[in-house]
Structures are given as structure tokens and as C-alpha cells.
Amino acid sequence: MGRVGVLLLNLGGPDKLEDVAPFLFNLFSDPEIIRLPFRWLQKPLAWFIASRRTKTSQENYKQIGGGSPLRRITEAQGEALKEQLHYLGQEANIYVGMRYWHPYTEEAIALLTQDNLDNLVILPLYPQFSISTSGSSFRLLERLWQEDPKLQRLEYTVIPSWYKEPGYLQAMAELIRQEIEQFPHPDQVHVFFSAHGVPKSYVEEAGDPYQQEIEECTALIMQTLNRPNPHTLAYQSRVGPVEWLQPYTEDALKELGAQGVKDLVVVPISFVSEHIETLQEIDIEYREIAEEAGIHNFRRVPAPNTHPVFIRALADLVIDALNKPSFKLSQAAQIKKMVKMYPPESWEWGMTSSAEVWNGRIAMLGFIALIIELVTGQGLLHMIGLLQ
């Protein structure tokens, strides 16, 4: 089989407070994060949003030590995976490629091309596929492959999603069981799955399979857990005025509190590493909301991180991928051709659902332009005298 490499893909996060602003700019510059009909608007809007959010985001990072632990944990996962693969008889070089911060995916690609690999397994550290996570990284990699003849000669395969992997389900079930057993009455504990949300339009318009995979994953984990505990699935981290997948985590917590739930354990289902969404958003913000709602016993299941069962699951995924027919980036970037890119092939005008979507987007852009002009004091309306 020759020299084997494994490329671990993840989001990335600011290592220190000074990194927050450029990290946010990179994040919102991605058209898979904010989908606009005109690409030339992407970077100006990203700059505006990043400028407005930097201070608040820095305050949040201060609460968890001044930076994200994501890089450190991901690199530890890579080392543990390398050791596990060695134990199973498969030698491999491990590379970490982050989408929005160092080490960037491009940096990882530069390293692996220098190592003259014969086979590469591309493994996103997102159990469930979404156009805004794995899909974004796959599209970037697809472009890099198209631009580099050396990459085109490399044998590779992609693991698009792996939420059904038995070892992953077992690791999650073990982590949940450990937390539940800390309560005085374990069978009464409400298991609360909190997944990172995405705009509803991603699912309904673009065909993102994320919601379906999250729901299936939740059911499989509960089946593996094999306990009578009630459970809820909700979505966190909503940003902006558009509708995201519901129920929202904060609303679901309030509703459970109103129903009299006192014991609750939160499961961060779409996260395999601790980072801002677990350490700050769940542990601090959502804990406060839950306690105010009357949920007095609030615990959180830790992310899998380097849990041995989880690392073994990743190793099994790699070995299985090496022994199966290859799955290419062109396939992974468009899972079953369900995921569409904007703009669509042709514009539609009139009272159709597609036209209404586009009319709404144009109205949204006009609103954004107005807000930017009001904040900056510069723009067309000031030039023609309608605003002073």
C-alpha cells in the first residue's frame, strides 16, 4: 500500500484573543457560512460582521482561558490516532487541516505533498455532513486538487460522514452513561442533545442532509445507550435574523423547566472536541438559562476528545476506507447531488417559491447595505443627500 497519510479536517479556532477578529473574518468570508447571491459582497459583509462581533466574541473566549483549545485537542487526537493505527498494524502520517485558522488546510496539503504519500484518507472530524462544515472543506480541497498536478497523482479517498460508526456510538453512550450515573436518580435524568444549528434554508433549499443525519444519530445513540431516559434534540449557536433549525436550545431548556424537569444532562452531539460552543455556550450560557428555568441539576457530557473507544473508532474508519473503493471529493462535495450551490442555474421571477427566496435575499441585501451605511456614515444614500 506504500506510504499512508490521514488528513483530519476541522473548523479551527483562535489560539489567543488577538486572533479572534481575523478568525471571524475568515469564517464569515466562506460562502457556505453566509450564502449570498453576489460573491463580491462576501468579504465586505464578512468584515462588517467580524468587526461588530469581535469584542463580544473576545469576552466569550476570555471566559474559557483566552483562546480555543481546538487545535491542541485535534493535534492530540491525531497523535492518539497514529498510535492506535500503529497498534493495529497500519502505519500512517497524520495531518491536521483547519478551515478558518492555523494550521490551515492549505498548510496541511503543503506538508503532505512533501512527504510523497501513496495513499491519503481524508477524515473530517464532523460525524454528520453539512454543507457548512465538511462540505466547505471538501469544496476547498476539490479546488486545491484541480490546481495541483501532484495532488492529482495521489491516490486518496474521502469519508464524507460517519455518525453510524459503532465505535463512535459506543463512545458517546459510555460518556452519557457516566454522567447519568452521577445523579441520585439516574433513570429520571432528561438527556438533552444539543447540536450546532444551521439556517433552515440550508436543509429546505440547498438539500443539506445535516438535520436528517443529526436526528438519525440521536436515535442511534439512544438505542446504543439502552436506557429508559427521556430525551430531547435541539439546536444551538444561532446567528443573525434568519430562521435556523428548531427547536432552539435556549427555548427547549425553558420549556423543559416549565414542565418540571429538574435533572438534565446535555450531550454536545455534533462536537468531538471541546471548544467555545461547549465550554462557554453550553457550560456557562445554557447552564444559566436552565437554572433560571428551574432545572437545578445540570451536567454536560464531555466531548469525545481522546476517549480510547472514540480513537479506536477513528482508526477503524481509516482502515476500512483504505480497503474499500475510493470515494472522491467530487462525490463528497455533492452528497447524492442533493446539495446545490448558489446561484441556481437560472433566475426565476414571479410568484414562485424559488423567486420568493431570491426576492427575499435581495431585500435582505438592501437591508444589510442600509445598516452598514447607517453605521459607517458613508454610502450612496449619503452621497445623494437622502441621509446626512
Swiss-Prot record:
InterPro entries per the record? Ferrochelatase, Ferrochelatase_AS, Ferrochelatase_C, Ferrochelatase_N
Q: Which residues form the signal peptide?
A: none
Q: Name one GO molecular function term.
A: ferrochelatase activity
**PROSITE patterns for the chain:** FERROCHELATASE
Q: What is its EC number?
A: 4.98.1.1
Q: Which reaction does it catalyse?
A: heme b + 2 H(+) = protoporphyrin IX + Fe(2+)
Q: Which SUPFAM superfamilies match?
A: Chelatase, Chlorophyll a-b binding protein
**UniProt record similarity statement:** Belongs to the ferrochelatase family.
Protein's name according to its UniProt entry: Ferrochelatase
User: What is the scientific name of the source organism?
Assistant: Nostoc sp. (strain PCC 7120 / SAG 25.82 / UTEX 2576)
